[in-house]
Regions:
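Zinc-dependent deaminase
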Residues: 1-21, 85, 89-164
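Short, basic and Ser/Thr-rich N-terminal targeting/leader segments
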Residues: 22-26, 72
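Short beta-strand scaffold segments in enzyme catalytic cores
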Residues: 26-34
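Short secondary-structure boundary/capping segments
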Residues: 28, 67-68, 117-119
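A short acidic/small-residue loop/turn micro-motif
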Residues: 44-46
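Helix-adjacent hinge/juxtasegments
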Residues: 51, 56, 60-93, 97
Length: 164
């Protein structure tokens, strides 16, 4: 297992924890000098906030641990391609390299829909996509399949109650 796979696996485990909590399974770690300095997982539902993204949580924790907002020596590993908000935070934090697993065709801002890292901002993180891609895709598909089944069951249950 490569060092990159080791860190992505740590992010993937956080994604699994998010799924167990009923959140979309996205996990993230920030790494500096070979050590994890920030961890985050999706918590939009739990915290009732649109800002509850894994990347934002991991970046905030890394900034606190390292004592500053410039994370230019850090890499970020995330299971799902960052959205525009998170890509902006990555640029602002000066993250060196972003590794992501699954592409996001609906909100991906690192190549799928757009690539904020290619725009003329003051910082351009390097980008590595597709790391542990299948594991990340499988986790997302499993979550959304279960969510759809649960919603169908709830709908059927409501129908039964109305017909009684």
């Amino acid at each position: 297992m490569t060092e990159q796979e080791k860190f992505m696996k740590a992010a993937w485990k956080l994604a699994q924890k998010a799924a167990e909590e009923g959140e979309v399974p996205v996990g993230c770690v920030v790494v500096c000098d070979g050590k994890i300095v920030g961890r985050g997982r999706n918590r939009r539902e739990t915290k009732k906030t649109a800002l509850g993204h894994a990347e934002l949580e991991a970046i905030q924790k890394a900034c606190k641990k390292l004592g500053g907002w410039r994370l230019h020596r850090c890499d970020l590993y995330v299971t799902l391609e960052p959205c525009p908000m998170c890509a902006g935070a990555i640029i602002n934090a000066r993250i060196k390299t972003v590794y992501y697993g699954a592409s996001d065709q609906k909100a991906g801002s690192c190549g799928s829909l757009t690539n904020l890292f290619e725009l003329p901002y003051n910082h351009k993180p390097e980008l590595v996509s597709g790391l542990m891609e299948q594991e990340c895709v499988d986790e997302l598909q499993k979550f959304f399949k279960a969510l759809r089944a649960r919603k169908r069951a709830e709908k059927e249950h409501r129908k039964q109650l109305q017909s009684e």
